[in-house]
């Protein structure tokens, strides 16, 4: 069997598994966010933090809850990293001395679900920081994204109310009822597949292929690896991330990790359909996501298997930066999944992808990561795209646009348009400033188009809360740590505030009955329109920069 055939089978089994779990997991999440029953552990947490689980919040109060929780999380994680040398389970290594700028960058990175890492995990973060700091944020940052998505769905589903639910209840339920149970099962499977789970610091001795002994730090890897993928976080315990055999030992654990990356994102549209009382609407959103996912993955595999470039042509495969235990096709599927979501984990070196393969990873992030996108953020991003699509369709036929019985008035379209202006503004401004500063240009390992691609990739990844990188960029500097930290913060919280404002505006409306002129939003035509609007918006925004970077490199 050729590697191409094996890769296609790998992808087909993955898609089939996602289809199988779409309805049961989506229905389960629907019940989690709509039930009135609280678990005993949840009631205890509510008492400890002083929350009335039956009270609801306006969009402003919900947004303040998100911002307050995230701000406290950033401060806690920032301090934890700086004092880790005085805590148990720290690394006895000079490299563990975090600079304030790196601690800031890392704290913002994990709280915003980005997991950009300007450091080597196994030599910088002690086990206590990994567990009590980074792993905890992997859970709660994903739960924040799901909570915001559910709040927007409630905005569509509710009529003439200013309330969107309770952020603290949604946060706790998402963590305890969805992320934690799946993570427990996934961690056991990873350990069974060979991932490590221990508290060793520097005494994990392995034998290399050459027969010599090598000491590699151990740690609680499997428990962090599973939520890293499930919560679309992406930060690796090791610098090599999911290419490291202690994190991702075999081809089937590689498949499992890709499945974990995609499973919640592709199941949330079912939750959306159930909550608005029309499952067909959920299928339409899932179809847009699936179409873009398959299109992107197909192009990624094509570009990687075409042997484009001098070295791939000479050796017969684009194997630079690729683990032999995975191969080119499986690594291509992983690269597409990790950049179509907000994960950013890698099982190969993205800087070593073919020029056009690297362009696909950037384009995936520039789509807004909506196919299926980050945990929660993918759904609310796609719903904002649906709002823009019905607005465009309404202009074409001269009718006031409507979506799910809600009129898309000037306020709603301004909020939706602002949502999609935030990220390009951050990406293009940050890239332009970095390229204008000689000191920051010196951080590029390559000149010419690929050097530009490294910087563009960094700001694209940070602003879209992805966290992957073209590793040729030396990003652990005062300027990059600060600038990318700001890009991550603004790229996360400005869109969230705009989404919640949109949800509040929609929730206050009544319901407009369908008429003969209402655009059907559950049919294939609408699926095609949303996909088309997504591609056009991205192409008009980023094509000039892509032409100067990866496209120019590919033509050369």
From Swiss-Prot:
Q: Which InterPro entries match?
A: KdpA
Q: Which domain of life is it from?
A: Bacteria
**Entries under Pfam families matching the protein:** KdpA
The yes or no answer to whether the keyword Transport is present is: yes
Q: Which residues cross the membrane?
A: 6-26, 65-85, 133-153, 176-196, 249-269, 283-303, 378-398, 419-439, 483-503, 526-546
Q: Does the keyword Transmembrane helix apply?
A: yes
Gene Ontology CC annotations of this record:
plasma membrane
Q: Enumerate the subcellular locations listed in this protein's record, separating them with semicolons.
A: Cell membrane
Q: Which UniProt keywords apply?
A: Cell membrane, Ion transport, Membrane, Potassium, Potassium transport, Transmembrane, Transmembrane helix, Transport
Major subcellular location class = membrane
- Which membrane topology term applies here? Multi-pass membrane protein
Any single GO molecular-function term of the entry would be:
potassium ion binding
Q: How does it assemble?
A: The system is composed of three essential subunits: KdpA, KdpB and KdpC.
Job description of the protein: Part of the high-affinity ATP-driven potassium transport (or Kdp) system, which catalyzes the hydrolysis of ATP coupled with the electrogenic transport of potassium into the cytoplasm. This subunit binds the extracellular potassium ions and delivers the ions to the membrane domain of KdpB through an intramembrane tunnel.
Q: What family is this?
A: Belongs to the KdpA family.
Q: What is this protein called?
A: Potassium-transporting ATPase potassium-binding subunit
Which organism's genome codes for this protein?
Mycobacterium avium (strain 104)
Taxonomic lineage of the native organism = Bacteria, Bacillati, Actinomycetota, Actinomycetes, Mycobacteriales
């Amino acid at each position: 069997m050729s590697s191409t055939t094996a890769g296609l089978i790998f992808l087909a089994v993955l898609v089939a598994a996602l289809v199988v779990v779409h309805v049961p997991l989506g229905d389960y999440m629907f019940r989690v966010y709509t039930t009135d029953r609280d678990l005993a552990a949840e009631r205890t947490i509510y008492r400890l933090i002083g929350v009335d689980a039956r009270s609801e919040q306006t969009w402003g109060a919900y947004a303040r809850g998100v911002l307050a929780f995230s701000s406290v999380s950033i401060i806690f994680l920032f301090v934890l990293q700086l004092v880790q040398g005085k805590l148990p389970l720290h690394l006895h290594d000079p490299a563990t001395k975090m600079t304030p700028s790196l601690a800031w960058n890392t704290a913002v990175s994990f709280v915003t679900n980005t997991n950009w890492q300007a450091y080597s995990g196994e030599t910088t973060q002690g086990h206590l920081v990994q567990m009590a700091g980074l792993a905890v944020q992997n859970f709660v940052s994903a739960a924040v994204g799901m909570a915001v998505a559910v709040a927007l769905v409630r905005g569509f589903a509710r009529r003439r109310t200013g309330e969107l639910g309770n952020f603290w209840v949604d946060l706790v339920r998402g963590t305890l009822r969805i992320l934690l149970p799946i993570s427990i099962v996934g961690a056991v499977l990873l350990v069974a597949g060979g991932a490590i789970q221990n508290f060793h610091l520097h005494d994990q001795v392995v034998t290399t292929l050459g027969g010599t002994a090598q000491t590699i730090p151990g740690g609680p890897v499997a428990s962090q690896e599973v939520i890293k993928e499930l919560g679309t976080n992406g930060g690796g315990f090791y610098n090599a991330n999911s290419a490291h055999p202690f994190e991702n030992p075999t081809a089937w654990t590689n498949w499992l990790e890709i499945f974990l990356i995609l499973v919640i994102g592709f199941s949330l549209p079912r939750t959306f359909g159930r909550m608005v009382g029309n499952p067909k609407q959920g299928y339409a959103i899932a179809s847009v996501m699936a179409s873009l996912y398959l299109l992107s993955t197909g192009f990624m595999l094509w570009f990687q298997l075409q042997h484009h470039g001098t070295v791939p042509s000479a050796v017969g495969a684009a194997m630079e930066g690729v683990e032999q235990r995975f191969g080119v096709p499986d690594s291509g599927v992983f690269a597409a999944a990790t950049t179509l979501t907000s994960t950013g984990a890698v099982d190969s070196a993205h800087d070593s992808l073919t020029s056009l393969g690297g362009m696909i990873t950037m384009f995936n992030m520039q789509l807004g990561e909506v196919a299926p996108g980050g945990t929660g953020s993918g759904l609310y991003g796609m719903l904002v795209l649906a709002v823009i699509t019905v607005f465009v369709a309404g202009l074409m036929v001269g009718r006031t646009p409507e979506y799910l019985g809600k009129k898309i008035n000037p306020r709603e379209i301004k909020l939706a348009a602002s949502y999609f202006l935030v990220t390009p503004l951050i990406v293009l401004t940050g890239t332009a400033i970095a390229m204008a500063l000689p000191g920051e240009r010196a951080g590029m390992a390559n000149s010419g188009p690929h050097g530009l691609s490294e910087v563009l990739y960094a700001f694209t990844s940070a602003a879209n809360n992805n966290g992957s990188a073209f590793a040729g960029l030396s990003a652990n500097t005062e300027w990059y740590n600060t600038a990318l930290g700001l890009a991550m913060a603004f790229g996360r919280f400005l869109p969230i505030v705009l989404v919640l404002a949109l949800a509040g505006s929609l929730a206050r409306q009544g319901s407009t009955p369908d008429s003969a002129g209402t655009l059907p939003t559950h049919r294939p035509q609408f699926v095609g329109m949303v996909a088309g609007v997504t591609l056009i918006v991205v192409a008009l925004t980023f094509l000039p920069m892509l032409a100067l970077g990866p496209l120019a490199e590919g033509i050369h």
